[in-house]
């Protein structure tokens, strides 16, 4: 099933390109590693469109429309071999000093022991230096459906704008 996800990612990117260019809002692209039960790790890739919602005295609150791709894992005793994707929407707060925090709700494509049902909740905390960010993210369905191991990831991000 792996060949399906690059095609879905391309379709999503092409569909989002006109609104992204029209709004000239920042776009974050990231890559990193995710871990789940017993530290089974894998590659992750992320993309997010972040139009400004409102400015505060010490930062900016942004809408976040994004996608996370989690590569399937081989040679594990858990059901983690299928690639999974989560498409999410939410909000992200970016302080002027670099602190970043966000939360969103999404839907998934693909099913594993770690990501096993909708909705999926995406929480983010990290730090941003101009165009570079280091973000810790957790994706989980909050035990609405079992199994629910979730994915916890560390992602290095580059901001385009």
Listing of model-derived features with the role each one plays in the protein:
Residues 63-105:
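Mid-chain, structured segments of secreted extracytoplasmic proteins
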Residues 1-24:
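Cleavable N-terminal export/targeting peptides
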Residues 34-44, 57, 73-83, 97, ...:
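Solvent-exposed loop/turn segments connecting transmembrane beta-strands
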Residues 95-99, 105-112, 134-137:
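A membrane-pore/channel beta-structure motif
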Residues 24-25, 117-161:
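Predominantly the C-terminal beta-signal and adjacent terminal strand-loop region
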Residues 51-59, 93-99, 126-131, 160:
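Outer-membrane beta-barrel strand-turn architecture
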Residues 29, 101, 105, 125:
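Short glycine-rich loop/turn motifs that provide flexible caps or phosphate-binding loops at active sites
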Residues 20-75, 87, 151-161:
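Short glycine/proline- and aromatic-enriched beta-strand/turn motifs that initiate or cap beta-hairpins
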């Amino acid at each position: 099933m792996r060949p399906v996800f690059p095609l879905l990612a391309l379709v999503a990117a092409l569909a989002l390109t006109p609104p992204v260019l029209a709004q000239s809002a920042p776009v974050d692209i990231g890559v990193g590693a995710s871990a789940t039960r017993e530290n089974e790790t894998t590659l992750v890739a992320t993309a997010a469109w972040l139009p400004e919602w409102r400015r505060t005295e010490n930062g900016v609150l942004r809408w976040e429309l994004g996608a996370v791709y989690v590569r399937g894992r081989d040679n594990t005793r858990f059901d983690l071999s299928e690639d999974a994707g989560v498409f999410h929407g939410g909000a992200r707060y970016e302080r002027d000093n670099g602190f970043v925090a966000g939360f969103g709700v999404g839907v998934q494509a693909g099913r594993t022991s770690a990501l096993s049902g909708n909705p999926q909740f995406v929480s983010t905390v990290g730090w941003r230096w101009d165009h570079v960010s280091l973000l810790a993210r957790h994706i989980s369905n909050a035990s609405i459906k079992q199994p629910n191991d979730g994915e916890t990831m560390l992602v290095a991000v580059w901001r385009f704008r």
